[in-house]
Amino acid sequence: MDVMRSVLGMVVLLAIAFLLSVNKKKISLRTVGAALVLQVVIGGIMLWLPPGRWVAEKVAFGVHKVMAYSDAGSAFIFGSLVGPKMDTLFDGAGFIFGFRVLPAIIFVTALVSILYYIGVMGILIRILGGIFQKALNISKIESFVAVTTIFLGQNEIPAIVKPFIDRLNRNELFTAICSGMASIAGSTMIGYAALGVPVEYLLAASLMAMPGGILFARLLSPATESSQVSFNNLSFTETPPKSIIEAAATGAMTGLKIAAGVATVVMAFVAIIALINGIIGGVGGWFGFAHASLESILGYLLAPLAWVMGVDWSDANLAGSLIGQKLAINEFVAYLNFSPYLQTGGTLDAKTVAIISFALCGFANFGSIGVVVGAFSAVAPHRAPEIAQLGLRALAAATLSNLMSATIAGFFIGLA
């Protein structure tokens, strides 16, 4: 029964995308079908097949080892504030976001910059991009951007496409925005993992976002023009560093900007949520609903969607609330509020944890529209009006991609 509910959830999400399509007659069943199959296959390999699960577990172990090295750098700056004694001192509540999550983002961004400098990332992107392009019957630039989003976030996509943004047609531009919103950056993945989110889920969600972003981009905005971009004019960085030291330093400074942005937004929005909850609770108290909050309202509104995705009805309000927080605010705040349920002795079952973990794994939120419009407009001011028009539709496509990955995850966890 649960498995069939997950299948129903996939159908519902596809139906929503079809209804939102701007040109239903031009939808390519070849591309849409291949993207859906690839998204399901990646989910099955990572979550259901023993070899795939083994690989995911090993990668997760490696990520945790990387995080341990990040803690070494944090400890040099903050001393015992990142040590295990903090948990003892504060009775298990010694995890400080600013001392554990933000330094990890800086470290991993520097590491990724080094990997780009020595050519590892470029080779991976070119190989995977070529395979992806043939499998899904999409343009080379679309496959390039989709694969790049495994490693980089939506903030970096404009810099990547800048050398040829004038040659991008409207559909390719839309796909680039969707892919960025549907994915997460490697640096922020470390941040989510530091909050207790299972790394194997984050890794699987990141990989599934590749075909997922293409799937819903092509459903909502089918391709109607031929591509004018080839792999011969792709550039991985706008101004390549001249040495490995410069690459590390540049990456660290970029990581600092990302960490500062994350800290600023999370701090502001947590405070804003507290204010909103105070207002809602105060007004609700006049009518006997003193405990009403933004989270509870979002939970009620999105609970049916969470249920059809595979979440038990008893947990649907919580899942709906977290999905709503991610959409209205951002994924960091949602994961932050999800974190207590991931602790030892949590009340959620494995399937619900997986579905929520996947559903929150992406940059798709209303704030991202502003980020995308601002970032793309900076490299292509003349296309700013067009980018602004695509923003809301791209958010819908990216959100559906995240929810589809979550539904597929629930399907395979239910089979296990």
Show the residue positions of the predicted features.
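Interfacial/capping segments of alpha-helical transmembrane domains
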Residues: I45-L81, S230, I276-L301, S314-L322
